[in-house]
């Protein structure tokens, strides 16, 4: 199956045509959900249609006995390069980043995979001029009832962009979180940040985090919905 699409505004050329939007997504070819890889599709318009890149996967994974790479999101670094953040079960996992020169799909330059420590596998960034913000799906309480494959607390943290993301010191500062006490749901998962089309903050004053809550037990699937939590950043950056 394929899932977890992430769309960004980014101009690239492919087979003599110019495209304005890119989509990265997870693709898996096994019933046990191992061997996940990251694919690429492109479009001239945000609404599509999206054309699958014919040299996929963009980020490959060889081992069929492990989960692989996926659940990606992109920050547009400049007119030629993206920063691709994703979950990985390589030695650099569980959360990684690559810089990829992607403005010409006939000449892609895939940067080395960098480990980003101190964050959970399901983490998603947004940039401002001074800071990088990160929402992460975490497991705070024991997860015993189904759905056991998602977490219970979505955490929001930040660090200055001057700090090394791959550094060996945990510089992440928590702003807040959305957990069972805040939402009324035992599961809170798959968070993301409201950004512009290139992955940057819309305002320095507030941050909107989206996430999915769920009930536990047999009705978990029918309880999925989209919620949001708004954080006032003025109180954190006086």
Residue positions per predicted region:
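Beta-rich carbohydrate-recognition and catalytic domains
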Residues: 1-3, 8-67, 75-121, 126-186, ...
């Amino acid at each position: 199956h394929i899932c977890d699409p992430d769309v960004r505004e980014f101009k690239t050329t492919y087979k003599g045509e110019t495209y304005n939007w890119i989509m990265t997504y997870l693709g898996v070819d096994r019933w046990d959900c191992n061997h996940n890889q990251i694919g690429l599709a492109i479009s001239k318009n945000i609404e599509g249609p999206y054309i699958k890149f014919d040299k996929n996967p963009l980020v490959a994974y060889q081992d069929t006995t492990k989960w692989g790479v996926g659940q990606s999101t992109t920050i547009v670094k400049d007119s030629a390069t993206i920063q691709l953040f994703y979950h990985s079960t390589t030695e650099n996992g569980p959360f990684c980043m690559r810089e990829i020169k992607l403005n010409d799909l006939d000449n892609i330059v895939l940067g080395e995979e960098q480990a980003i420590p101190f964050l959970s596998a399901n983490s998603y960034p947004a940039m401002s001029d001074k800071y990088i913000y990160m929402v992460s799906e975490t497991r705070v309480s024991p997860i015993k009832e189904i759905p056991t494959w998602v977490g219970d607390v979505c955490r929001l943290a930040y660090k200055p962009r001057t700090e090394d993301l791959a550094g060996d010191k945990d510089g992440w500062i928590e702003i807040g979180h959305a957990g069972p006490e805040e939402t009324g749901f035992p599961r809170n998962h798959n968070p993301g940040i409201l950004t512009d089309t290139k992955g940057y903050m819309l305002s320095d004053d507030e941050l909107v985090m989206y996430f999915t809550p769920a009930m536990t037990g047999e009705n978990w699937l029918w309880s999925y919905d989209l919620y949001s939590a708004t954080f006032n950043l003025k109180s954190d950056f006086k």
